[in-house]
């Protein structure tokens, strides 16, 4: 048995895969003794996704030898969404080219998914000269993106000293969400200079899909630069997105 991995709380794991599946059709997951990782770009090459789940967040983690498995994200998502919050998720791979997915709750359900050939992405997360860093609650970011979607297909992020603004402007409507450190929704802000950049609402909508209300989200960006959005899974796991900017005319 090349690996057997157990995660308590099937629904939480499903939300991670659901978020990624909205941006990519297939993925190559690296399974090593240290944990599970995946890096991929969406077909339009606008968003880079980087997932890192260390072995410590799993209740059981046994890997005989490092392996890379390719999966269809839509198929994986549909199966994992059958799990509930208190269900146990078990991932196994034997010698055959299948991933065995078991969901244990009021009953034990086992699915076998064929693995596929997926080209591994050998791309490093670039070190960018960000000039602004903000930490917000997941609920606030999700609401802001939803508000922006009502009036425009892009949203502008503006960071000033002690102030973070998310703003969208349509032909006849506009919306502005302003946060200061006095607001519960803004947890931290570091600004080297006033920073502005716009991003596509549709991509952000997919990126924030898996956020919980109390999740802390770290956003880093620069003037008309890519935005890095990151949040943690059980303190040690991490999901990171790098989103290309919308260059304004």
Swiss-Prot record:
Q: Which InterPro entries has this protein been placed in?
A: DNA_clamp_sf (IPR046938), Pr_cel_nuc_antig (IPR000730), Pr_cel_nuc_antig_C (IPR022649), Pr_cel_nuc_antig_CS (IPR022659), Pr_cel_nuc_antig_N (IPR022648)
Superkingdom to which the source organism belongs: Archaea
MF terms (GO), sorted A to Z:
DNA binding; DNA polymerase processivity factor activity
One of the GO biological process terms = regulation of DNA replication
Q: Which UniProt keywords apply?
A: DNA replication, DNA-binding
Self-association and partners? Homotrimer which circularizes head-to-tail (head is a N-terminus, tail is at C-terminus) to form a toroid. RFC opens the toroid so it can load on DNA. Interacts with both Pol I (pol) and Pol II (polB-polC), with Hel308 (hjm) and with Hjc. Interaction with the C-terminal PIP-box of RfcL may stabilize the toroidal structure.
* Function noted in UniProt: Sliding clamp subunit that acts as a moving platform for DNA processing. Responsible for tethering the catalytic subunit of DNA polymerase to DNA during high-speed replication. Unlike its eukaryotic paralog, loads on circular DNA without the replication factor C (RFC) clamp loader, although RFC greatly increases loading efficiency. Stimulates the ATPase activity of replication factor C (RFC) in the presence of ssDNA. Stimulates the helicase activity of Hel308 and may alter its substrate specificity.
Please give the family membership noted in the entry.
Answer: Belongs to the PCNA family.
Q: What is this protein called?
A: DNA polymerase sliding clamp
The protein's organism comes out as Pyrococcus furiosus (strain ATCC 43587 / DSM 3638 / JCM 8422 / Vc1)
The UniProt gene name for this protein comes to: pcn
């Amino acid at each position: 048995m090349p690996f057997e991995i157990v995660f308590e709380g099937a629904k939480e794991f499903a939300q991670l895969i659901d978020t990624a599946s909205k941006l990519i059709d297939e993925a190559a997951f690296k399974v090593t003794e240290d944990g599970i990782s995946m890096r991929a770009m969406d077909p339009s090459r606008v968003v880079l996704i980087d997932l890192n789940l260390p072995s410590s967040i799993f209740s059981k983690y046994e890997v005989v030898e490092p392996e890379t498995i390719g999966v269809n994200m839509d198929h994986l998502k549909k199966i994992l969404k059958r799990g509930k919050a208190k269900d146990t998720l078990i991932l196994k791979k034997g010698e055959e080219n299948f991933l065995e997915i078991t969901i244990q709750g009021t009953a034990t359900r086992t699915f076998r998914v064929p693995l596929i050939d997926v080209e591994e992405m050998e791309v490093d997360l670039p070190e960018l000269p960000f000039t602004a860093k903000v930490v917000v609650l997941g609920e606030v970011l999700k609401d802001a993106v939803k508000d922006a979607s009502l009036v425009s297909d892009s949203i502008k992020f503006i960071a000033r000293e002690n102030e973070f603004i998310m703003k969208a402007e349509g032909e006849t409507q506009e919306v502005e969400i302003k946060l200061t450190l006095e607001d519960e929704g803004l947890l931290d802000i570091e600004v080297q200079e006033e920073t502005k950049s716009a991003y596509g609402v549709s991509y952000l909508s997919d990126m924030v899909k898996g956020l919980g209300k109390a999740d802390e989200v770290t956003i880093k960006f620069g003037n008309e630069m890519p935005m890095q959005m990151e949040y943690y899974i059980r303190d040690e796991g991490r999901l990171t997105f790098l989103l290309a900017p919308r260059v304004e005319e």
